[in-house]
């Protein structure tokens, strides 16, 4: 079965993806024409910062372009720690998909990542602690194994592996682990070569743009205790700007709100029931408006502040 590029967009080059738009079209051209891809990329980056799981790429209309737009965005932001966190989060997301793949697809992905892993004659051994027979049918030369696992934990030490005639034998879970580690390294490497001098200032501005927190939200954040409407306003605001559950829990911690997770699920809802932050008119009725911002909704100030 052929690999699904919608699940693993890194297996397709950006140049190949852009061919469907005709000659001469660049990613920059597409991004300057519409901010949808930038918004989706920034959402992935925000989820990384918040510690939330990244959505699978199959949820996007243009998964390959979202992938490369995110890499471009990270290169422009130029935050080494964030890049590493993102690569880790992506590897984790891809790893969950790898567990659903058959062995042929796993070996194909390994090949695309330049991992020298092969299917070998199965080797069986008795694991005394677990009192069962273990079978491993993938193998990699020990020199390559050391290279692939140099940044991994103790469990991956060569001394703890099955070594036979110069080859380390792996089971399916170990194979997936090496693929995920290779994906993480590949993502970091793919960000480095980007030539930032060739990126228009307008595009840099779109990616680097950070919204201003509205005065009404700042005023609520400054309080020591919150009433029900203030709690609702904060949670819906942060949901609407893309902050994940863990980030919202962290913000609400100081107010001793015990049911943040339940409120998050309630206000996030689905497409038919999702809540949005109150309009400025409603905020005035509730006594939560503290400034004349000349907008109809606090979200306008956040999203349009630096355009």
UniProtKB/Swiss-Prot annotation:
Cofactor dependency: [4Fe-4S] cluster
Binding sites annotated in the UniProt record for [4Fe-4S] cluster: 216, 280, 289, 293
UniProt keyword annotation of Iron present: yes
Transmembrane segments: none
Single biological process term from Gene Ontology: DNA replication, synthesis of primer
CDD domains: PriL
The record's free-text note on cofactor binding: Binds 1 [4Fe-4S] cluster.
Keyword Transferase: no
Keywords: 4Fe-4S, DNA replication, Iron, Iron-sulfur, Metal-binding, Primosome
GO cellular component: primosome complex
Pfam families from the UniProt entry: DNA_primase_lrg (PF04104)
Subunit structure: Heterodimer of a small subunit (PriS) and a large subunit (PriL).
Function: Regulatory subunit of DNA primase, an RNA polymerase that catalyzes the synthesis of short RNA molecules used as primers for DNA polymerase during DNA replication. Stabilizes and modulates the activity of the small subunit, increasing the rate of DNA synthesis, and conferring RNA synthesis capability. The DNA polymerase activity may enable DNA primase to also catalyze primer extension after primer synthesis. May also play a role in DNA repair. Possesses a template-independent 3'-terminal nucleotidyl transferase activity.
Protein family: Belongs to the eukaryotic-type primase large subunit family.
Protein's UniProt name: DNA primase large subunit PriL
Species assigned in the record: Saccharolobus solfataricus (strain ATCC 35092 / DSM 1617 / JCM 11322 / P2)
